[in-house]
Amino acid sequence: MNDLDVALRAADAADAVSLAGFTERSFVVEHKADASEVTAIDRATEEAITAVLRTAFPDDAIVGEEFGRIGPATARREWYVDPIDGTSNFVRGVPVWGSLIGLVVDGMPVTGVVSAPALGRRWWATHGAPAHLNGRVIRASDTASLDRAFASISVTQSWRDAGRGPALESLTRHVARVRNYGDFWQHMLVAEGALDVSIDAIGLKPYDIAALVPIVAAAGAAWSDRFGAPQWRGDTIVCANPHLHAAVIAQLTA
């Protein structure tokens, strides 16, 4: 069984736990030290993913949002797991949340699965193969100018705190339409070609990004940190079709 097959099996295990919890709504909401929300469903979902990965690849490292790192610090192969990306949506009954499972080999994300069972959508890709949504090949858009672009932008205090609020707001005036779909979904919509640009909040962690990169790249879109570097360990991710990415970064860094 190859890496992608195992990641898809892990996503199946995650969906079984998370969707049941979302539907039953019997969880208690707790708060972490950083005030972010978490439930027992987050932890149980990460455990379900980890069990599949550990069984298939016992020598690999796993880095999860809820339980941290399992396995050797020097492992060439690392799985980055966000069991429920969009917990704030999950706890409020908003169906935009999903499990992120990304494989990093020698420091580069090569396989990614994003599963959003409440939306009935799953995206995946592995290096050298097309990106898929529910078994259908997807491609980024070919919109060639910012003034015709549809963008999803997470306009948050984090951008203002970084001194980039005015630059982000300027960008909103240069595109055709702006929405905030948030979290993983906006980047998957760029991979699908439904959106042209997606800009996340500042303050992300590697487990928020690792699974996204292979899918966005395999769909023919461009991705980077907010400075334009192909750095998935940065504090945010910016995605766009290849015609627009440089222009977006130019606006953000102006």
Where are these regions (language model features)?
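A structural micro-motif
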Residues: 27, 60, 129, 175-176, ...
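Short acidic/glycine-enriched loop/turn segments that link adjacent beta-strands
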Residues: 35, 119, 231-233
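An extended, acidic
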Residues: 140-254
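DPxDG-like acidic metal-binding loop motif
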Residues: 73-132
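Short loop/edge segments at beta-strand edges and connector loops
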Residues: 64-66, 135, 182
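A structural micro-motif at secondary-structure boundaries
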Residues: 132-140
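Residue-level signal for inorganic ion chemistry
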Residues: 14, 18, 42, 53, ...
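N-terminal subdomain of lithium-sensitive/metallo-dependent phosphomonoesterases centered on the IMPase/IPPase/PAP
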Residues: 1-84, 244, 249-250
